Amino acid sequence: MKTCWRSLLRDLRTIKDMKKILTCLLATLGLTTACGQQNFENTDVQGFAELIADTSVVVLDVRTAAEFAEGHIQRAILIDQGQSDFVEKAKAALPIDKTIAVYCRSGRRSANAAGRLTDVGYKCVNLKGGIMAWQGANMPVTKE
């Protein structure tokens, strides 16, 4: 009889442990899903080119000044997203009522910048693959 009770208690502890593990897994899944949500659009080179053909769309390059000098998309405004005052500079330079077409070298920094800008009210579209994809598709860049 004693062994039966011990076995039952052990099983109950195991069930409680499983509930805790399941709860933690579900919480982690929920947090991962929430963190993975984007509040901006990603587009490919063709979509980006069509978007910026509309001159009311603001083109934003978020790379460094040195990268920008090597070549950038026509009409691009440079605001380095790596600077601590990036959002403040963006607020001062970019109209809140216009779509912002954001790019960087590979698409990672611009995705970060697009997320930060949409958090403060901007509508952003990120170029997947960045200027590397743009140039890879033989799209024009300028040094002017």
Predicted segments, located by residue:
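Rhodanese-like catalytic fold shared by cysteine-dependent sulfurtransferases
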Residues: 3, 19-22, 32-51, 57, ...
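Short, surface-exposed ligand- or partner-binding patches at beta-edge/loop junctions that are enriched
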Residues: 103
